[in-house]
UniProtKB/Swiss-Prot annotation:
Keywords: Cytoplasm, DNA-binding, Metal-binding, Nucleus, Repeat, Transcription, Transcription regulation, Zinc, Zinc-finger. Residues 70-96 are annotated as: Disordered. SMART domains: ZnF_C2H2. It comes from Saccharomyces cerevisiae (strain ATCC 204508 / S288c). It is found in: Cytoplasm; Nucleus. This is Transcriptional regulator MET32. Interacts with MET4 and MET28. InterPro entries: Znf_C2H2_sf, Znf_C2H2_type. One of its GO terms (cellular component) is transcription regulator complex.
Length: 191
């Protein structure tokens, strides 16, 4: 199989050299193959494969067998700088991307990143007063409140812990209110 691949690559290289010298004497099948290669290269323009230099100004890709004719007058492009800050990532369309430090999620707005980062808190700030389930966002708590899941969780809590659960939930709710007041006070004094 390797001998066939080597023979094919040799024939293709010779055909490309012939193409670069005189386009009129090319087999129509070779012309079609070259058009396909050019179209594929246009689609994959951003991806630059590692090329192995060969004779006659022809480069052959070591992985995919792609063939590329070198232009003698082409100047090498300067290497791109990789000095990008983690917060200043940009996608292919040029818009900024904000990456979460704890997981691999990326967001197009910094506000979305801040909202997402709350999900990584050890103690979630919004606690359901009925079942004790914690939520990172208030809107998620509102959606959850008094749903079948909430009632099921409450039933499980009551059967597992008895009536002492109500007292525990009140303490959690009270400490949550105090925690929010402290955060609001600290945030307003820094502004």
């Amino acid at each position: 199989m390797e001998d066939q691949d080597a023979a094919f690559i040799k024939q293709a290289t010779e055909a490309i050299v012939d193409v670069s010298l005189n386009i009129d004497n090319i087999d129509p099948i070779i012309k079609e193959l070259l058009e396909r290669v050019r179209n594929r290269q246009n689609r994959l323009q951003n991806k630059k494969p590692a090329l192995i230099p060969a004779e006659n100004g022809v480069d052959i890709n070591s992985q995919g067998g792609n063939i590329k004719v070198k232009k003698e007058n082409a100047l090498p492009k300067p290497p791109k700088s990789s000095k990008s800050k983690p917060q200043d990532r940009r996608n292919s369309t040029g818009e900024k991307r904000f990456k979460c430090a704890k997981c691999s999620l990326e967001f197009s707005r910094s506000s979305d990143l801040r909202r997402h980062e709350k999900t990584h808190f050890a103690i979630l700030p919004n606690i359901c007063p009925q079942c004790g389930k914690g939520f990172a966002r208030k809107d998620a708590l509102k959606r959850h409140y008094d749903t079948l899941t909430c009632r099921r969780n409450r039933t499980k809590l009551l059967t597992a812990g008895g009536e002492g659960i109500n007292e525990l939930l009140k303490k959690v709710k009270q400490s949550n209110i105090v925690h929010r007041q402290d955060n609001n006070h600290n945030g307003s004094s820094n502004g």
